[in-house]
Amino acid sequence: MRHLHHQTSQTKLWAVIPAAGSGSRFSKTELKQYQYIQDATVIEHTVKRLSQLPLTGYVLAIGKQDTFASTLSFQDKHKAHFCNGGVERVHSVLNALNYLSQIADEDDWVLVHDAARPCVTFECLNTLVKNAIETNQSAILAIPVRDTLKQVNQEQQIDKTVSRELLWQAQTPQIAKIGILKKAIETALKNNLTITDEASALESIGESVQVVMGRSDNIKITYPDDLELARLILQSQN
């Protein structure tokens, strides 16, 4: 596969990592992005993966009281920028985009990636960015839904089986141009829309978003036992 370095000589590529969340399924004292896998935190593994791309820089949106993030040994630490996160993920992303808009061009590309997805592969990252740049279109990593889906009522009884034929499970990174994504999120928030990822904001302003085939091992660490799974995945990938 052709790699990106020659394609991005004019195109600047940035990354945003929202990392202000408390991770409600971990105990209050334990932020999931700061759990250790082997000798590095989850977020250090995540940044290391993203840094395989020719990034101009990356922005970590962290909690206001977070004094830990800046002490970590991030890959290419000279490219690291920090900003305050927000109440929810979408606000953290918008804060990071506002920060970026002071140092980047609105036509630069930005990847938004979950802090707790340390297992994304270079092949997936490379394909995603290449597709976005070549088609000049926003894109996300996603995988087709493979399990049978059930719609249930409030009593946890099955109402019906949902066809999975056209359903894909969204992952991150999700890539768009800085100016377009910023406008999409601002518009969605103004209209009180529920924004669960960047694509949902882009969809709400009629922006086309393509799906790029991801991998099922690009897991998001959500529960404490996901840490062991992530450790095994990282081990097998290396």
Swiss-Prot record:
UniProt site positions, description: Transition state stabilizer: R25, K32
CDD domains named in the record: CDP-ME_synthetase
Reactions this protein catalyses: 2-C-methyl-D-erythritol 4-phosphate + CTP + H(+) = 4-CDP-2-C-methyl-D-erythritol + diphosphate
Pfam families: IspD
Gene Ontology biological-process entries: isopentenyl diphosphate biosynthetic process, methylerythritol 4-phosphate pathway
Swiss-Prot/TrEMBL keywords: Isoprene biosynthesis, Nucleotidyltransferase, Transferase
Entry's family note: Belongs to the IspD/TarI cytidylyltransferase family. IspD subfamily.
Site positions for Positions MEP for the nucleophilic attack: R164, K220
Entry EC number(s): 2.7.7.60
Metabolic or biological pathway: Isoprenoid biosynthesis; isopentenyl diphosphate biosynthesis via DXP pathway; isopentenyl diphosphate from 1-deoxy-D-xylulose 5-phosphate: step 2/6
Keyword check for Repressor: no
Broadest EC class assigned to this enzyme: transferase
Chain's role: Catalyzes the formation of 4-diphosphocytidyl-2-C-methyl-D-erythritol from CTP and 2-C-methyl-D-erythritol 4-phosphate (MEP).
Molecular function (Gene Ontology), one example: 2-C-methyl-D-erythritol 4-phosphate cytidylyltransferase activity
InterPro entries per record: IspD, IspD/TarI, IspD/TarI_cytidylyltransf_bact, ISPD_synthase_CS, Nucleotide-diphossugar_trans
Protein name from the UniProt record: 2-C-methyl-D-erythritol 4-phosphate cytidylyltransferase
